[in-house]
């Protein structure tokens, strides 16, 4: 992503190779600050407190968390301790477990003296893979947008609705749901994005920050405005991300995604999910089996932003002592999804389509579970 003319990724290794640097997303879009993570404990805090967020990025930072841990204690006990520390930070996003399992499976049979270097190399490999996957999703998704553009009068704008932030800030680079939009924009297809504010963490502000940095027209809307826009023909398609997708195609994503899918279904608006393969949980069929994270009620009862003095602060919006139900995710059944935009192409949201497209990965994942 370009910020004031300079390209950034969301995570990178420091110049001295001893730390992992991230962009503190809790300060965006008001302040751009880089934080150096120097331990597995700091990586865990960064994930838990949402300095970084988005399923793919969480996985990458967790992998680097293991590498950071190997700097301090590469013993069997240390490896397991860092795994246990990181795995409990965010229970819903499957990329976290996928990345940590990959790290521990590779490191556990190595000599202690070899683990540090291999851990850093593998974490970097996982990061590079994420960039490649997301760019491919963008290329395939841009064709979906092009097909819709071709059905409209020449020069007409394609209006796309997205929920939460599944862009560059949710991955290492490019993003998932926003990657097709970036590619379409680069290819000269006129697009406009309806950006859900996405309460309570207001990730829509992050999406607006991204799109604005790339010069892509967009409008920030209240979460409940999407259905109205669809009823009036102002949405050509929806593209969202996913934190975990089951083997049969049910999608767990940011709370409110399900309601957007229902509105899209009722108004015959195509509803696509940008799906990188590491986000598929082949061990779960029914989306109801996915653990749904419940976060601190303060996120619900307070708003975090910048005050007139230019300071970041919390503002209470509810009576003191109000009980809050802060569910972070919901599940959209596969029947409401038009298709998955993956790194290998676009497929139907069904068990058979996913199994056909990713037969090799499914087999490998299930074999790993058996061991």
Swiss-Prot record:
The keyword Transmembrane helix does not apply. It comes from Escherichia coli O45:K1 (strain S88 / ExPEC). Disruption phenotype: Inactivation of the gene precludes growth of the strain with 5-deoxyribose. Belongs to the eIF-2B alpha/beta/delta subunits family. MtnA subfamily. It catalyses: 5-(methylsulfanyl)-alpha-D-ribose 1-phosphate = 5-(methylsulfanyl)-D-ribulose 1-phosphate; 5-deoxy-alpha-D-ribose 1-phosphate = 5-deoxy-D-ribulose 1-phosphate. Its EC number is 5.3.1.23. The active site is at residue 243. This is Methylthioribose-1-phosphate isomerase. The record marks 164 as: Transition state stabilizer. Substrate binds at residues 53-55, 90, 203, 253-254. Catalyzes the interconversion of methylthioribose-1-phosphate (MTR-1-P) into methylthioribulose-1-phosphate (MTRu-1-P). Also catalyzes the interconversion of 5-deoxyribose 1-phosphate and 5-deoxyribulose 1-phosphate. Part of a bifunctional DHAP-shunt salvage pathway for SAM by-products. It is an enzyme of class 5 (isomerase). Keywords: Amino-acid biosynthesis, Isomerase, Methionine biosynthesis. Pathway: Amino-acid biosynthesis; L-methionine biosynthesis via salvage pathway; L-methionine from S-methyl-5-thio-alpha-D-ribose 1-phosphate: step 1/6. InterPro entries: IF-2B-related (IPR000649), IF-M1Pi (IPR005251), IF_2B-like_C (IPR042529), Initiation_fac_2B_a/b/d (IPR011559), M1Pi_N (IPR027363), NagB/RpiA_transferase-like (IPR037171). PANTHER family: METHYLTHIORIBOSE-1-PHOSPHATE ISOMERASE. GO terms for molecular function: S-methyl-5-thioribose-1-phosphate isomerase activity. One of its GO terms (biological process) is L-methionine salvage from methylthioadenosine.
């Amino acid at each position: 992503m370009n910020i004031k003319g300079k390209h950034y990724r969301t995570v990178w290794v420091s110049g001295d190779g001893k730390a992992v640097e991230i962009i503190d997303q809790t300060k965006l879009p008001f302040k751009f600050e880089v934080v150096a993570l120097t331990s597995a404990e700091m990586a865990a805090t960064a994930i838990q407190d949402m300095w970084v967020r988005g399923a793919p990025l969480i996985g990458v930072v967790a992998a680097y968390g293991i590498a950071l841990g190997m700097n301090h204690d590469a013993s069997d006990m240390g490896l397991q301790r860092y795994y246990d520390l990181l795995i409990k930070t965010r229970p819903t996003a499957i990329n976290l477990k996928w990345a940590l399992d990959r790290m521990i499976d590779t490191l556990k049979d190595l000599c202690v003296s070899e683990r540090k270097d291999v851990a850093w190399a593998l974490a970097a490999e996982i990061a590079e893979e994420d960039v490649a996957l997301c760019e491919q999703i963008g290329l395939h998704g841009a064709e979906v947008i092009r097909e819709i553009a071709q059905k409209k009068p020449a020069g007409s704008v394609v209006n796309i609705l997205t929920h939460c932030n599944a862009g560059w800030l949710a991955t290492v680079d490019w993003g998932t749901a926003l990657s097709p939009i970036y590619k379409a924009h680069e290819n000269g297809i006129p697009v406009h994005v309806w950006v859900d504010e996405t309460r309570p963490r207001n990730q829509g502000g992050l999406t607006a920050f991204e799109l604005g940095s790339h010069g892509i027209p967009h409008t920030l809307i209240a979460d409940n405005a999407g259905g109205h826009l669809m009823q009036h023909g102002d949405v050509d398609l929806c593209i969202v991300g996913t934190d975990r997708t089951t083997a049969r195609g049910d999608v767990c994503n940011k709370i409110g995604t399900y309601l957007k899918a229902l509105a899209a279904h009722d108004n015959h608006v195509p509803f696509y999910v940008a799906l990188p393969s590491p986000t598929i949980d082949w061990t779960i069929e029914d989306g109801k089996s996915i653990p749904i994270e419940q976060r601190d009620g303060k996120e619900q009862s307070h708003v975090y932003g910048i005050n007139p003095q230019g300071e970041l602060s919390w503002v209470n919006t509810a009576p003191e002592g109000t009980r809050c139900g802060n569910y972070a995710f919901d599940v959209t059944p596969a029947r409401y999804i038009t298709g998955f935009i993956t790194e290998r192409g676009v497929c139907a949201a069904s068990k058979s389509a996913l199994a056909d497209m990713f037969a090799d990965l499914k087999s490998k994942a299930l074999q790993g579970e058996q061991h």
